[in-house]
Each structure stands twice: as structure tokens, then as C-alpha cells.
């Protein structure tokens, strides 16, 4: 008998769920007052420690663990500033308000106490704060229920999934000691599922066209089969799940010096049914995130192409996960694993009590 799929309800389902894995993800393309370009990614993960089966997290002394990844990129200077926290401490009042509210920090105080937060100030309006940004975002369209109903199936695995595809954004970013005012457009994903970690591979794209059209495209592979997903939001807000997606990697390949992973940084996206043909290319080559034994590429795109005979341009984001890695630096892996272990072996209870006091 097929498992009943509960429809997504707002605002209840913006909060946390009793699932194996869950994340609240944002990306965006921004400009300052001089027209200089920047991008960001911000993602807080929640995982059931025993069931998610991520190797280096399995010994953590909690039921659920939170961890945090973010990137701020300076497009002109071709530099990116990643932050990876293997564990985040969430405050007691998180998920306790009528609208989404998460307050968290790192238990490792390298640069002093720093508070990070995601707060829904009004329905589908958010304030996002982390190490390098303080942004206000307002959704101009209703949530995109991915897959048509907010539930997707990839290679036999089910997941609840919705997106806010057009978030009008303004605020500040911080590079070094410099505070920069910015405006732009952001994208939000919220996904939760009862699936364990696996070495599956996926190539994911969020596209925001200047014409007001947004597009999500994904190819997912478990090594035996592939699943393709594509959803579109039209300029008038209509939504549609599309079939026949083709994702064709180009010849622009970047090889990581750390992991030896080869990432294709240019792609062609085709949906013949809707006469969509888009070419996307990365704005910065090195956007690799390393999380223990897991590495992935995440970064901004420029987009150009044709929809139904009309030329279109825009911006986007790409995520490449599960691409073959051939670590050549054993010492680097050893240091990473030792750093992860340090989170849990150095008086974890005393350290966590101190963090909870700060977050009360």
C-alpha cells in the first residue's frame, strides 16, 4: 500500500519536522550601489544522527544535530568566502513562534560569539543573518510546490520540497572589515525527507530570468538509474511541472586542487516541450565546499538562451554533488577528520551548556 503523502501547509510546514534529514537553503545574486556583483549561499541542516548515517556524525551524543554551510562570493575579484560548521547549537526558542524562527551559533568560538538567525517577520518575508550578511527578503510569488504537490520522487526516494523562487532582497554584506549595501534577488528551498546519506550524485539548477520566469532543474542518479525533475514558475505566477529535461555538460571543466574532483562549469538546459534552450556558466571557478568526507560545488551562474523563440537572459545557481573525488592529500583528510572529532571529544556537554546559556 502506497504511503499517504500529506499536503504541505503554510505556515506550519516552514518549521522543523520529525524527519531524518531537513534543510533551509537560500541563494542569491546581489549588486552594490556601484553595480559590482556578489552572490551568497546559506544553508542550515538538521539530521537524525543515528538514521542519517553520515559517517563522521554518527557518534554525536544527540538525537538531532544541526550543521551550517555558507558562501559569500565577490564576482569581480573572483573570490569566495566559505563557512562550514560541523555542528550548530540551536536556541530553545527556535521553532516556537507562529512563523519560522531559527536562532543558532557555532560552539567553537574562533572569532568570539556570533549569532546567526533566520526569522520570518511576516508571511513569506524573511530576515537572514550570518557571519557575512544581513539581508531582508520578500517573496513576490506564492511558494512553488515542487513536483506539482510539494513532494518529489527520485530513484525511489521521496521528499517534501517547496521553493520561493523570487525573493526581492536588500541589506548588507561584509567582506573583511568592509560593510557593503546590496540589493538583488534570492531563492529559497525547504526540503525534508526520511532518507539516509548515500553517495548519490546530482546536478541541480535554480534559474531566475529577467523576463520574470523561474526554473528548477535537477538530474539525480543513484548509480543504477536517473531521475529528472523540472518545475517552472511563469511571470504571472502560474506553476507547471515539466517533462523531457535534458542537462548537457559542456567542456568547461574545473578540477579541485584539494579533492581532484572535476566539476563541469558550463551546461545546456533543454526542455523541448516548452521550446526552452538555456546555456548556463559559472561566474567563479572555485566554489567547492568540503564537509568532512563530502565535497560539492555550489555557486552563481550567468544564463542566456531562448524560450519559444524569444531570447532570454538571467542569473542562477548550480549545485554539483557526488562527483567522483580522488583525494591526493591524505594529510588534508586527516586534519579535517581530526577537526570534526574535536567537536565531540573536547568536553561536549560543558561546551554545549555554555552555548545554551548564551542563546537563552
Q: Which sequence ranges carry the predicted segments?
A:
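Structured soluble/peripheral alpha/beta segments that form catalytic or ligand/cofactor-binding pockets
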Residues: 1-360
